[in-house]
Protein backbone atom coordinates (compact mmCIF):
# COMPACT_ATOMS: atom_id res chain seq x y z
CA UNK A 1 0.00 0.00 0.00
CA UNK A 2 1.46 3.42 -0.97
CA UNK A 3 2.47 5.72 1.88
CA UNK A 4 -0.01 8.41 0.83
CA UNK A 5 -2.84 5.91 1.38
CA UNK A 6 -1.43 4.89 4.75
CA UNK A 7 -1.38 8.54 5.83
CA UNK A 8 -5.13 8.76 5.10
CA UNK A 9 -6.01 5.84 7.37
CA UNK A 10 -8.38 7.07 10.07
CA UNK A 11 -8.84 4.03 12.36
CA UNK A 12 -6.99 1.03 13.76
CA UNK A 13 -9.09 -2.00 14.67
CA UNK A 14 -8.74 -5.54 16.02
CA UNK A 15 -10.94 -7.81 13.85
CA UNK A 16 -10.30 -11.14 15.62
CA UNK A 17 -7.93 -13.47 17.40
CA UNK A 18 -7.73 -17.23 17.84
CA UNK A 19 -5.73 -19.72 19.88
CA UNK A 20 -4.99 -23.36 19.14
CA UNK A 21 -4.45 -25.24 22.39
CA UNK A 22 -2.90 -28.20 20.55
CA UNK A 23 -0.07 -26.14 19.04
CA UNK A 24 0.17 -23.14 21.37
CA UNK A 25 -0.33 -20.84 18.38
CA UNK A 26 -2.20 -17.54 18.73
CA UNK A 27 -3.25 -15.56 15.64
CA UNK A 28 -3.89 -11.85 16.15
CA UNK A 29 -5.60 -9.91 13.34
CA UNK A 30 -5.34 -6.13 12.92
CA UNK A 31 -6.63 -3.62 10.38
CA UNK A 32 -5.96 -0.04 9.37
CA UNK A 33 -9.04 1.43 7.70
CA UNK A 34 -9.62 4.60 5.71
CA UNK A 35 -11.20 6.09 2.59
CA UNK A 36 -8.90 4.05 0.31
CA UNK A 37 -9.75 0.69 1.89
CA UNK A 38 -7.92 -1.28 4.53
CA UNK A 39 -4.55 -2.79 5.31
CA UNK A 40 -4.69 -6.08 7.22
CA UNK A 41 -2.02 -7.67 9.39
CA UNK A 42 -1.76 -11.02 11.19
CA UNK A 43 0.72 -11.65 13.97
CA UNK A 44 1.56 -15.18 15.12
CA UNK A 45 2.67 -15.89 18.68
CA UNK A 46 3.53 -19.46 19.65
CA UNK A 47 3.64 -20.40 23.33
CA UNK A 48 5.54 -23.40 24.71
CA UNK A 49 3.16 -26.21 25.62
CA UNK A 50 2.88 -27.87 29.04
CA UNK A 51 3.71 -31.54 29.57
CA UNK A 52 0.06 -32.29 30.42
CA UNK A 53 -3.19 -30.62 29.33
CA UNK A 54 -4.03 -27.46 31.32
CA UNK A 55 -7.06 -27.27 33.59
CA UNK A 56 -10.22 -25.47 32.52
CA UNK A 57 -9.34 -22.72 35.00
CA UNK A 58 -5.96 -22.16 33.35
CA UNK A 59 -7.45 -22.19 29.86
CA UNK A 60 -10.05 -19.59 30.86
CA UNK A 61 -7.41 -17.38 32.49
CA UNK A 62 -5.12 -17.75 29.48
CA UNK A 63 -7.94 -16.53 27.25
CA UNK A 64 -8.24 -13.32 29.27
CA UNK A 65 -4.47 -12.72 29.11
CA UNK A 66 -4.53 -13.25 25.34
CA UNK A 67 -7.32 -10.69 25.01
CA UNK A 68 -5.00 -8.11 26.57
CA UNK A 69 -2.04 -9.28 24.50
CA UNK A 70 -4.06 -8.97 21.29
CA UNK A 71 -4.66 -5.29 21.95
CA UNK A 72 -1.19 -4.44 23.28
CA UNK A 73 0.73 -6.22 20.48
CA UNK A 74 -1.19 -4.13 17.96
CA UNK A 75 1.02 -1.16 18.74
CA UNK A 76 3.59 -2.52 16.24
CA UNK A 77 1.10 -2.09 13.39
CA UNK A 78 -0.69 1.04 14.57
CA UNK A 79 2.53 3.02 14.18
CA UNK A 80 2.69 2.52 10.39
CA UNK A 81 -0.07 5.12 10.02
CA UNK A 82 -0.86 6.52 13.50
CA UNK A 83 -4.58 7.14 12.84
CA UNK A 84 -6.56 9.30 15.23
CA UNK A 85 -8.98 6.49 16.15
CA UNK A 86 -8.08 3.37 18.14
CA UNK A 87 -11.17 1.13 18.19
CA UNK A 88 -11.00 -1.70 20.74
CA UNK A 89 -12.64 -5.06 19.95
CA UNK A 90 -14.62 -5.59 23.16
CA UNK A 91 -15.54 -3.94 26.47
CA UNK A 92 -12.72 -3.57 28.99
CA UNK A 93 -12.63 -2.47 32.60
CA UNK A 94 -11.01 0.81 33.69
CA UNK A 95 -7.65 -0.73 34.63
CA UNK A 96 -7.31 -2.49 31.28
CA UNK A 97 -8.30 0.68 29.43
CA UNK A 98 -5.71 2.62 31.42
CA UNK A 99 -3.03 0.14 30.34
CA UNK A 100 -4.03 0.29 26.67
CA UNK A 101 -4.15 4.09 26.71
CA UNK A 102 -0.71 4.37 28.28
CA UNK A 103 0.91 1.82 25.95
CA UNK A 104 -0.33 3.65 22.84
CA UNK A 105 0.58 7.12 24.16
CA UNK A 106 3.44 6.99 26.66
CA UNK A 107 4.82 3.81 25.13
CA UNK A 108 4.89 5.52 21.72
CA UNK A 109 6.10 8.88 23.04
CA UNK A 110 9.59 8.59 21.56
CA UNK A 111 8.05 7.52 18.23
CA UNK A 112 5.69 10.51 18.36
CA UNK A 113 8.57 12.87 19.17
CA UNK A 114 10.83 11.62 16.38
CA UNK A 115 8.00 11.69 13.80
CA UNK A 116 6.46 14.98 15.02
CA UNK A 117 3.07 13.39 15.77
CA UNK A 118 1.78 15.14 18.92
CA UNK A 119 -1.73 13.70 18.46
CA UNK A 120 -0.39 10.26 19.42
CA UNK A 121 0.34 11.56 22.92
CA UNK A 122 -3.36 12.45 23.31
CA UNK A 123 -4.83 9.28 21.78
CA UNK A 124 -7.82 7.79 23.61
CA UNK A 125 -9.20 4.34 22.71
CA UNK A 126 -12.83 3.88 21.73
CA UNK A 127 -14.21 1.19 24.04
CA UNK A 128 -17.41 -0.70 23.09
CA UNK A 129 -20.16 -0.47 25.68
CA UNK A 130 -21.19 -3.53 27.64
CA UNK A 131 -20.41 -5.51 30.74
CA UNK A 132 -17.09 -7.28 31.24
CA UNK A 133 -17.55 -10.83 32.52
CA UNK A 134 -15.68 -11.32 35.83
CA UNK A 135 -12.55 -13.47 35.45
CA UNK A 136 -12.32 -17.00 36.82
CA UNK A 137 -9.09 -16.27 38.70
CA UNK A 138 -5.88 -18.24 38.98
CA UNK A 139 -3.55 -18.47 41.99
CA UNK A 140 0.18 -18.23 41.18
CA UNK A 141 1.31 -18.39 44.81
CA UNK A 142 3.93 -21.04 45.55
CA UNK A 143 4.46 -21.93 41.91
CA UNK A 144 7.79 -21.95 40.09
CA UNK A 145 8.72 -18.44 38.84
CA UNK A 146 9.38 -17.65 35.20
CA UNK A 147 12.48 -15.43 35.05
CA UNK A 148 12.79 -13.33 31.89
CA UNK A 149 16.28 -13.50 30.35
CA UNK A 150 17.59 -10.95 27.88
CA UNK A 151 21.27 -11.83 27.93
CA UNK A 152 22.42 -8.85 29.99
CA UNK A 153 23.75 -8.39 33.50
CA UNK A 154 20.36 -7.43 34.98
CA UNK A 155 18.48 -10.62 34.11
CA UNK A 156 21.49 -12.69 35.18
CA UNK A 157 21.44 -11.04 38.62
CA UNK A 158 17.72 -11.85 38.99
CA UNK A 159 18.15 -15.43 37.81
CA UNK A 160 20.99 -16.05 40.24
CA UNK A 161 19.18 -14.39 43.17
CA UNK A 162 16.19 -16.68 42.66
CA UNK A 163 18.27 -19.78 42.07
CA UNK A 164 20.57 -19.28 45.07
CA UNK A 165 17.58 -18.75 47.35
CA UNK A 166 15.95 -22.01 46.30
CA UNK A 167 13.11 -20.51 44.26
CA UNK A 168 13.92 -22.77 41.28
CA UNK A 169 13.40 -20.26 38.43
CA UNK A 170 12.78 -21.18 34.81
CA UNK A 171 14.59 -18.88 32.34
CA UNK A 172 12.22 -17.47 29.70
CA UNK A 173 12.65 -15.49 26.51
CA UNK A 174 10.81 -14.47 23.37
CA UNK A 175 12.60 -15.37 20.11
CA UNK A 176 15.84 -16.28 21.89
CA UNK A 177 19.01 -15.51 19.95
CA UNK A 178 22.47 -17.03 20.35
CA UNK A 179 23.31 -14.60 23.18
CA UNK A 180 20.27 -15.59 25.26
CA UNK A 181 20.78 -19.26 24.52
CA UNK A 182 24.39 -19.00 25.71
CA UNK A 183 23.26 -17.39 28.98
CA UNK A 184 20.70 -20.16 29.48
CA UNK A 185 23.38 -22.79 28.96
CA UNK A 186 25.70 -21.02 31.41
CA UNK A 187 22.93 -20.99 34.02
CA UNK A 188 22.53 -24.77 33.77
CA UNK A 189 18.75 -24.38 34.06
CA UNK A 190 16.13 -25.72 31.63
CA UNK A 191 14.53 -22.84 29.72
CA UNK A 192 11.23 -22.02 28.06
CA UNK A 193 10.82 -19.88 24.95
CA UNK A 194 7.94 -18.35 23.02
CA UNK A 195 8.02 -17.27 19.40
CA UNK A 196 6.69 -14.02 18.01
CA UNK A 197 6.31 -13.69 14.23
CA UNK A 198 5.57 -10.17 13.10
CA UNK A 199 3.60 -9.98 9.86
CA UNK A 200 6.12 -9.65 6.97
CA UNK A 201 3.84 -7.00 5.47
CA UNK A 202 5.01 -4.67 8.24
CA UNK A 203 8.63 -4.99 7.12
CA UNK A 204 7.62 -4.33 3.51
CA UNK A 205 5.78 -1.16 4.54
CA UNK A 206 8.71 -0.01 6.64
CA UNK A 207 11.10 -0.57 3.74
CA UNK A 208 8.80 1.51 1.54
CA UNK A 209 8.95 4.43 3.97
CA UNK A 210 5.98 3.96 6.31
CA UNK A 211 6.06 5.68 9.67
CA UNK A 212 8.34 3.78 12.01
CA UNK A 213 10.02 4.06 15.38
CA UNK A 214 10.50 2.72 18.89
CA UNK A 215 7.67 0.68 20.42
CA UNK A 216 7.07 -0.48 24.03
CA UNK A 217 8.20 -4.02 23.28
CA UNK A 218 8.66 -4.90 26.96
CA UNK A 219 4.89 -4.57 27.46
CA UNK A 220 4.31 -7.07 24.66
CA UNK A 221 6.94 -9.55 25.83
CA UNK A 222 5.70 -9.27 29.41
CA UNK A 223 2.20 -10.38 28.42
CA UNK A 224 3.65 -13.20 26.31
CA UNK A 225 5.54 -14.30 29.43
CA UNK A 226 2.41 -14.16 31.60
CA UNK A 227 0.48 -16.16 29.00
CA UNK A 228 3.27 -18.76 28.98
CA UNK A 229 3.23 -18.94 32.76
CA UNK A 230 -0.54 -19.49 32.95
CA UNK A 231 -0.58 -22.09 30.18
CA UNK A 232 2.24 -24.04 31.84
CA UNK A 233 0.90 -23.81 35.40
CA UNK A 234 3.81 -21.68 36.61
CA UNK A 235 4.11 -18.81 39.06
CA UNK A 236 4.93 -15.12 38.70
CA UNK A 237 6.87 -13.61 35.82
CA UNK A 238 10.01 -12.02 37.24
CA UNK A 239 11.46 -9.12 35.27
CA UNK A 240 14.74 -7.28 35.82
CA UNK A 241 13.85 -3.64 35.23
CA UNK A 242 15.75 -1.20 37.43
CA UNK A 243 14.63 2.12 38.90
CA UNK A 244 16.37 4.31 36.30
CA UNK A 245 14.03 2.87 33.65
CA UNK A 246 11.42 5.31 34.96
CA UNK A 247 13.69 8.31 34.27
CA UNK A 248 12.60 10.29 31.14
CA UNK A 249 14.98 11.39 28.39
CA UNK A 250 13.34 14.77 27.80
CA UNK A 251 10.08 16.75 27.82
CA UNK A 252 8.26 17.45 24.53
CA UNK A 253 4.86 19.06 23.96
CA UNK A 254 4.32 18.94 27.73
CA UNK A 255 4.87 15.17 27.90
CA UNK A 256 7.71 13.06 29.25
CA UNK A 257 9.54 11.16 26.53
CA UNK A 258 11.04 7.99 27.98
CA UNK A 259 12.76 5.42 25.75
CA UNK A 260 12.34 2.86 28.54
CA UNK A 261 8.73 3.66 29.50
CA UNK A 262 7.50 0.06 29.23
CA UNK A 263 10.30 -0.98 31.61
CA UNK A 264 9.36 1.70 34.15
CA UNK A 265 7.41 1.35 37.37
CA UNK A 266 4.30 3.07 35.96
CA UNK A 267 3.99 0.51 33.16
CA UNK A 268 4.59 -2.31 35.64
CA UNK A 269 1.78 -1.09 37.89
CA UNK A 270 -0.63 -0.63 34.99
CA UNK A 271 0.08 -4.11 33.66
CA UNK A 272 -0.42 -5.67 37.09
CA UNK A 273 -3.68 -3.78 37.53
CA UNK A 274 -5.00 -4.88 34.14
CA UNK A 275 -4.06 -8.52 34.76
CA UNK A 276 -5.77 -8.53 38.15
CA UNK A 277 -8.93 -6.87 36.83
CA UNK A 278 -9.24 -8.71 33.51
CA UNK A 279 -7.63 -12.10 34.22
CA UNK A 280 -8.04 -12.48 37.98
CA UNK A 281 -4.28 -12.75 38.56
CA UNK A 282 -2.68 -11.53 41.79
CA UNK A 283 1.05 -10.78 41.84
CA UNK A 284 1.52 -12.33 38.39
CA UNK A 285 4.32 -10.00 37.33
CA UNK A 286 6.94 -7.78 38.95
CA UNK A 287 10.47 -6.50 38.55
CA UNK A 288 12.84 -7.94 41.13
CA UNK A 289 15.40 -5.16 40.62
CA UNK A 290 12.97 -2.23 40.65
CA UNK A 291 14.51 -0.49 43.67
CA UNK A 292 18.12 -0.88 42.51
CA UNK A 293 20.22 1.48 40.43
CA UNK A 294 22.12 0.25 37.39
CA UNK A 295 25.35 0.79 39.31
CA UNK A 296 24.11 -1.34 42.21
CA UNK A 297 23.18 -4.11 39.77
CA UNK A 298 26.57 -3.85 38.06
CA UNK A 299 28.36 -4.24 41.39
CA UNK A 300 26.28 -7.33 42.16
CA UNK A 301 26.90 -8.87 38.74
CA UNK A 302 30.66 -8.37 39.09
CA UNK A 303 30.59 -10.55 42.22
CA UNK A 304 28.59 -13.41 40.70
CA UNK A 305 31.01 -14.86 38.16
CA UNK A 306 30.35 -17.62 35.66
CA UNK A 307 28.81 -15.45 32.94
CA UNK A 308 31.75 -13.32 31.71
CA UNK A 309 31.99 -15.29 28.47
CA UNK A 310 28.30 -14.99 27.55
CA UNK A 311 26.86 -11.75 28.97
CA UNK A 312 25.98 -8.85 26.67
CA UNK A 313 23.74 -5.80 26.93
CA UNK A 314 24.52 -4.53 23.42
CA UNK A 315 21.59 -4.46 20.99
CA UNK A 316 23.90 -4.22 17.98
CA UNK A 317 25.70 -7.40 19.06
CA UNK A 318 22.56 -9.42 18.34
CA UNK A 319 23.14 -8.63 14.66
CA UNK A 320 26.88 -9.33 14.61
CA UNK A 321 28.00 -12.50 12.88
CA UNK A 322 31.13 -13.51 14.78
CA UNK A 323 30.57 -15.97 17.61
CA UNK A 324 32.81 -13.87 19.85
CA UNK A 325 31.24 -10.52 18.94
CA UNK A 326 29.07 -9.82 21.95
CA UNK A 327 29.71 -6.07 22.19
CA UNK A 328 29.97 -3.55 19.36
CA UNK A 329 32.01 -1.29 21.71
CA UNK A 330 30.63 1.85 20.06
CA UNK A 331 27.07 2.47 21.28
CA UNK A 332 25.53 4.13 24.37
CA UNK A 333 24.75 0.77 26.01
CA UNK A 334 28.29 -0.55 25.58
CA UNK A 335 29.70 2.70 26.96
CA UNK A 336 27.40 2.79 29.95
CA UNK A 337 27.72 -0.87 30.92
CA UNK A 338 31.52 -0.69 30.64
CA UNK A 339 31.53 2.43 32.84
CA UNK A 340 29.16 0.82 35.35
CA UNK A 341 31.15 -2.42 35.64
CA UNK A 342 34.66 -0.95 35.55
CA UNK A 343 34.81 0.20 39.22
CA UNK A 344 34.05 -3.35 40.37
CA UNK A 345 36.24 -5.40 38.02
CA UNK A 346 40.00 -5.55 37.47
CA UNK A 347 40.86 -3.87 34.18
CA UNK A 348 42.07 -7.12 32.68
CA UNK A 349 38.78 -8.87 33.44
CA UNK A 350 36.47 -6.22 31.98
CA UNK A 351 38.66 -5.84 28.91
CA UNK A 352 38.33 -9.58 28.36
CA UNK A 353 34.53 -9.41 28.80
CA UNK A 354 34.13 -6.62 26.22
CA UNK A 355 36.94 -7.62 23.87
CA UNK A 356 38.48 -4.17 24.28
CA UNK A 357 39.00 -1.25 26.67
CA UNK A 358 36.52 1.55 25.97
CA UNK A 359 38.10 3.86 28.54
CA UNK A 360 41.42 3.69 26.69
CA UNK A 361 39.82 4.88 23.44
CA UNK A 362 39.59 8.71 23.08
CA UNK A 363 37.05 8.24 20.26
CA UNK A 364 34.52 7.27 22.95
CA UNK A 365 34.71 10.68 24.65
CA UNK A 366 31.73 12.34 22.87
CA UNK A 367 29.46 9.44 23.79
CA UNK A 368 30.62 9.44 27.39
CA UNK A 369 30.08 13.20 27.65
CA UNK A 370 26.40 12.56 26.81
CA UNK A 371 26.10 9.84 29.44
CA UNK A 372 27.59 12.19 32.03
CA UNK A 373 25.23 15.04 31.15
CA UNK A 374 28.04 17.28 29.89
CA UNK A 375 26.63 17.41 26.34
CA UNK A 376 23.08 16.84 25.05
CA UNK A 377 20.39 14.79 26.77
CA UNK A 378 20.34 11.22 28.01
CA UNK A 379 20.63 8.96 24.93
CA UNK A 380 17.52 7.18 23.62
CA UNK A 381 18.84 3.88 24.91
CA UNK A 382 18.46 1.67 27.97
CA UNK A 383 21.15 3.37 30.02
CA UNK A 384 21.33 4.55 33.62
CA UNK A 385 20.87 8.01 35.06
CA UNK A 386 23.48 10.75 34.66
CA UNK A 387 24.10 10.64 38.41
CA UNK A 388 25.05 6.96 38.21
CA UNK A 389 27.59 7.67 35.47
CA UNK A 390 29.16 10.45 37.54
CA UNK A 391 29.37 8.19 40.60
CA UNK A 392 31.00 5.45 38.51
CA UNK A 393 33.52 7.96 37.19
CA UNK A 394 34.30 9.18 40.70
CA UNK A 395 34.97 5.59 41.81
CA UNK A 396 37.32 5.08 38.87
CA UNK A 397 39.17 8.27 39.75
CA UNK A 398 39.98 6.75 43.14
CA UNK A 399 41.50 3.58 41.67
CA UNK A 400 45.12 3.42 40.53
CA UNK A 401 44.25 0.93 37.82
CA UNK A 402 41.82 3.34 36.18
CA UNK A 403 42.47 6.97 37.04
CA UNK A 404 45.07 7.46 34.29
CA UNK A 405 43.01 5.87 31.52
CA UNK A 406 42.68 8.49 28.73
CA UNK A 407 38.88 8.67 28.80
CA UNK A 408 38.69 8.70 32.60
CA UNK A 409 41.16 11.56 32.99
CA UNK A 410 39.48 13.60 30.23
CA UNK A 411 36.01 13.09 31.71
CA UNK A 412 37.12 14.01 35.22
CA UNK A 413 38.23 17.38 33.84
CA UNK A 414 34.94 17.83 31.92
CA UNK A 415 32.40 17.11 34.66
CA UNK A 416 31.19 20.31 36.40
CA UNK A 417 31.71 20.82 40.12
CA UNK A 418 27.98 20.68 40.84
CA UNK A 419 27.85 17.13 39.46
CA UNK A 420 30.71 16.04 41.73
CA UNK A 421 28.88 17.46 44.74
CA UNK A 422 25.76 15.48 43.81
CA UNK A 423 27.80 12.32 43.35
CA UNK A 424 29.40 12.74 46.77
CA UNK A 425 26.00 12.47 48.46
CA UNK A 426 24.45 10.02 45.99
CA UNK A 427 22.25 7.15 47.16
CA UNK A 428 22.84 4.95 44.10
CA UNK A 429 23.76 2.00 46.32
CA UNK A 430 20.71 2.45 48.57
CA UNK A 431 17.59 0.60 47.37
CA UNK A 432 14.64 2.95 47.07
CA UNK A 433 11.50 3.98 45.26
CA UNK A 434 8.23 2.14 44.66
CA UNK A 435 8.25 -1.62 44.18
CA UNK A 436 5.71 -4.38 43.63
CA UNK A 437 8.10 -7.19 44.60
CA UNK A 438 6.60 -9.65 47.14
CA UNK A 439 8.55 -9.97 50.39
CA UNK A 440 9.68 -13.54 49.69
CA UNK A 441 11.36 -12.44 46.47
CA UNK A 442 12.75 -9.20 47.90
CA UNK A 443 14.47 -11.26 50.60
CA UNK A 444 16.04 -13.47 47.93
CA UNK A 445 17.49 -10.43 46.20
CA UNK A 446 18.73 -8.93 49.45
CA UNK A 447 20.87 -11.96 50.18
CA UNK A 448 22.76 -11.38 46.92
CA UNK A 449 23.18 -7.60 47.02
CA UNK A 450 25.00 -7.07 50.31
CA UNK A 451 27.71 -4.37 49.92
CA UNK A 452 30.98 -5.53 48.43
CA UNK A 453 33.83 -5.35 50.90
CA UNK A 454 36.68 -4.67 48.51
CA UNK A 455 37.02 -2.89 45.20
CA UNK A 456 39.74 -3.71 42.70
CA UNK A 457 42.36 -1.01 42.72
Curated annotation (Swiss-Prot):
Recorded GO CC terms: cytoplasm
UniProt cross-references to InterPro entries, sorted A to Z: MurL (IPR043689)
Alphabetical UniProt keywords: Cell cycle, Cell division, Cell shape, Cell wall biogenesis/degradation, Isomerase, Peptidoglycan synthesis
Entry keyword annotation includes Transport: no
Enzyme Commission (EC) number: 5.1.1.23
Covalent S-S links between cysteines: none
The protein's name in its UniProt record: UDP-N-acetyl-alpha-D-muramoyl-L-alanyl-L-glutamate epimerase
Molecular function in Gene Ontology: racemase and epimerase activity, acting on amino acids and derivatives
Enzymatic reactions: UDP-N-acetyl-alpha-D-muramoyl-L-alanyl-L-glutamate + ATP + H2O = UDP-N-acetyl-alpha-D-muramoyl-L-alanyl-D-glutamate + AMP + diphosphate + H(+)
Similarity comment: Belongs to the MurL family.
Gene Ontology biological-process annotations: cell division; cell wall organization; peptidoglycan biosynthetic process; regulation of cell shape
